[in-house]
Swiss-Prot record:
Cell compartments where the protein resides: Secreted
Keywords: Disulfide bond, Protease inhibitor, Secreted, Serine protease inhibitor
Keyword Acyltransferase attached: no
Protein name: Protease inhibitor carrapatin
Thylakoid is among the record's keywords: no
Chain's role: Serine protease inhibitor.
TM stretches of this protein: none
GO cellular component terms listed in the entry, alphabetical order: extracellular space
SUPFAM superfamilies for the chain: BPTI-like
SMART domains, alphabetized: KU
Marked site (Reactive bond) residue numbers: K18, G19
Biological process terms in GO annotation: envenomation resulting in negative regulation of voltage-gated potassium channel activity in another organism
Disulfide bridges in this chain: C8-C58, C17-C41, C33-C54
Amino acid sequence: AVDFDKQCVPTADPGPCKGFMPMWWYNIFTSQCEEFIYGGCQGNDNRYRTKEECDKTCAEASATWDVNA
């Protein structure tokens, strides 16, 4: 099961490292997966290698997520 609050709600967090890794994150305000640059360490769980993985995890789960829960 998807932990929507942990995997899809936080904003993109590139972390403190200086790598250059294009990743995807789910933006709850636009209900879209968006690209960002990940530094390679730390960050949060709202980070996906592909848009498809992001969509599958968060876009589908957002349909049943209750903002007031």
